[in-house]
């Protein structure tokens, strides 16, 4: 919530200086958003990217499709941000893009994979439907999906990400979580869920048949739906609550 408020205030403050890029792109089914790129997904019949930005040059912004993957990234920050030494006499370092405010409005026709890196937001208010759907997040991102329908949902999160899926249906979910991630997919009804958790995050899920748990650390797991809880390899203090 704090990140959302900060982003809104930043956008309002810098609105007079904000610039825009509009670009039609080739067909894609996957999106990779690199550090500093906030993403808002919109379903449509014409694939395109509308990007608003400030405190960064247009020549430093890259939008391209390779194969079926749309990549949006800043120069020299494809996977991680390039750092520079501050002139504060203490040797501290900061991102070369620390003042950049960037939001990509991406119109998609179909999606089966999302990847986000850094410390930003990814939002999709329209339905996502795919045979299989993969989500990967690295850093401290806020991810909100309104609706997901898929046969198999796989999520791999590293860091302190916050994932929420409001509703949907899937046969099976598989989570691999590293760090203190916060997951709320209790609105996504599933039959089977497999979890591998390393750290102290929280997981709120909904399963009708079985939840398999491997956990290392002290995660909190809340299970709705009446599934059988199968503790496989649990090292540490996993707090499991079943409704």
Please provide the spans of the model-predicted regions:
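Bacterial Sec-dependent N-terminal signal peptides
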Residues: 1-23
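Short, surface-exposed interaction patches in beta-rich subdomains
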Residues: 163-243
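Acidic (Asp/Glu) and glycine-rich low-complexity loops/linkers
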Residues: 19-117, 121-136, 147-156, 166-173, ...
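Glycine-centered small-residue hotspots that permit tight backbone geometry or close packing
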Residues: 5, 118, 234-238
């Amino acid at each position: 919530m704090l990140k959302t408020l900060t982003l809104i205030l930043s956008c309002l403050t810098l609105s007079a200086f904000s610039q825009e890029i509009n670009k039609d792109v080739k067909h894609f089914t996957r999106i990779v958003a690199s550090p500093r790129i906030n993403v808002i997904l919109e379903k449509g019949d014409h694939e395109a990217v509308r990007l608003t930005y400030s405190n960064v040059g247009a020549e430093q912004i890259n939008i391209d499709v390779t194969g079926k993957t749309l990549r949006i990234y800043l120069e020299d920050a494809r996977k991680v941000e390039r750092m520079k030494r501050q002139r504060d006499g203490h040797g501290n370092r900061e991102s070369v893009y620390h003042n950049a405010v960037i939001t990509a409005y991406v119109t998609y026709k179909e999606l089966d994979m999302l990847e986000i890196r850094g410390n930003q937001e990814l939002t999709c208010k329209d339905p996502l439907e795919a045979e299989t759907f993969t989500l990967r997040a690295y850093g401290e991102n806020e991810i909100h999906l309104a609706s997901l329908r898929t046969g198999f949902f796989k999520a791999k999160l590293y860091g302190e990400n916050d994932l929420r899926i409001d509703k949907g249906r899937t046969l099976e979910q598989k989570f691999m979580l590293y760090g203190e991630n916060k997951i709320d997919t209790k609105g996504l009804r599933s039959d089977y869920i497999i979890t591998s958790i390393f750290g102290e995050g929280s997981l709120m899920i909904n399963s009708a048949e079985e939840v398999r748990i491997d956990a290392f650390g002290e995660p909190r797991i809340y299970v709705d739906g009446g599934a059988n809880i199968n503790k496989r390899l649990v090292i540490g203090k996993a707090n499991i609550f079943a409704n």
